[in-house]
């Protein structure tokens, strides 16, 4: 059986998403599911696009849209799992989700992680992020 040895080939560049170490190293985030950690990495990537495109609210806070159907496709999961994964992030203090109503997708505001309280956010039941 032969294997291919890969060498740097610029014409076949691969895209990467950064996964922050603090999600695995900080005790506060140890209860967070791996799906929530991966989704947060993709949210951070979209945050950079939102910043470049000038997507900020009236207070200057960067926001993004991540419809539930896109979370389902990204994580290869069902709708309820996608909603619960966003809810986990909200309870962990990683994002703020603002409902817009009238069939519009929710705004997601990524938050700073330095001052997140230590809480068991998987058991919390308040709020429901939906698209």
Residue ranges and their predicted role:
Residues 22, 100, 113-115:
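Generic structural motif
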Residues 1-69:
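Short recognition helix of helix-turn-helix/winged-helix DNA-binding domains
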Residues 2-3, 112-131:
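Charged low-complexity intrinsically disordered patches
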Residues 34, 46-110:
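Winged helix-turn-helix DNA-binding recognition segment
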Residues 24, 43, 85-87, 128-129:
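A periodicity- and composition-biased signal for non-globular, repetitive helical segments
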Residues 37-41, 69, 106, 123, ...:
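Active-site-proximal helix/loop capping residues that flank conserved catalytic or ligand/cofactor
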